[in-house]
Structure formats: C-alpha cells, structure tokens
Amino acid sequence: VKDRIALAMIEDAERSGLLKPGATIIEPTSGNTGVGLAWVAIVKGYKTILTMPETMSDERKSLLRARGAELVLTPGAKGMQGAVDKAEELRDKIPGSIILQQFDNPANRAMHEKTTAEEIWRDTDGHVDILVAGVGTGGTLCGTAAGLKRHNPSLKAYAVEPDSSPVLSGGKAGPHKIQGIGANFIPGNFVREYVDGVIRVKNDDAIRTGRELSL
C-alpha cells in the first residue's frame, strides 16, 4: 500500500508547485514508505534522500539503496523522531529540497480513503465490520476507516501499537522491536474520530506471529 501514497504525495506536491523538476525529495522513514517513494521518484527523475533509524533491518536498507535512494542513518535510540529531525536539518541545507511529511500529509490519508477502503469494501462484498491496522503514520488505518465507515457507519476500527511504546494509548514513548509502526509520537494523520480503540502488542508476540505467518 505504500506505493500508492508515495505517488499521491509526490503528485500532490507537483500540482501545488512545491516539487519542481530536478528537486530532491527528503523523507524520514522506517523503510516501508521509503521503498515506494524511491521507486516513484526515480521514475519521475527526482533524487531521494531517506533518513532512517540505524536499527532498521539490513534488508530494508539494501532494498532502498537498490531503488536509488541515498540513506542517512540516525541513532536508533532516538526512534523516528531522530529521523524526522535529521530530515529537517538536511532540507534546510539542500537547495530545492522538500520533505513530503508522510506523517502529516493529508494526501496520505486521502489516498487510502479513495483506494484502499474501496478495494476492501468491493473485495469483501461489503461484509466487513472490523478493521485492525498497525499505526506508523496513521494514514492506512484512518484513511481506510474513513472510507469504510462511509459505507458502514457501525464499523469499528482499531489501531495497533507496540506495548513498550504506547503513545497512542496515552503512555510514554520507548524503544521497541516492531518495525514500521510505533513512531514514538502521535502523527497528524492519526485522526482519533475514526479510531474506536487501541491494541497494544508485545515485541515477542509480534515477532513470533510474524514468523508463524511466514511458514
């Protein structure tokens, strides 16, 4: 689903005049959105610099570099906030660069409302009453929930976050091992009116379940 938001954010920035030919796209990422951005950017002729916590997997780093992105690694202890801070620092230094702001960019959420929600509704013949999604930017959960609730107002949507960094639940940010979710801050695309509850998942449970599902 990350390729669709990459395209949406880039084309929105082009239409608004913020992204000009030959520009550099800078974005903090745990890797998922970065893959989509690097792919769309190279097709459209933009340079991509991605800031990422050093604790992300080697596979993610290799995949991003293979897509032509330049990686700038940040201290793992600072989580995604460290990557955000570094991206802003680079933007201020590099002329003609832009941060697409996936955590706050409404084009992220809107794309899921327009496409992901409609695909789920169509493919389930409307037989969906619960949506559960991990929260990184909040775009997937909240955009999809908004679209599905338009079809079924009684649908319930639940956010998943790391138990050791329960920011959405009102707790304190902390280190965790679940890549792609739990940014350690509440992103602008996390819109509480679309969320009916938060599920906290322990590191070991997430890792074990991921391995079981891969078999």
Name every feature range the model reports, one short phrase each.
Residues 1-215:
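PLP-dependent amino-acid enzyme catalytic core
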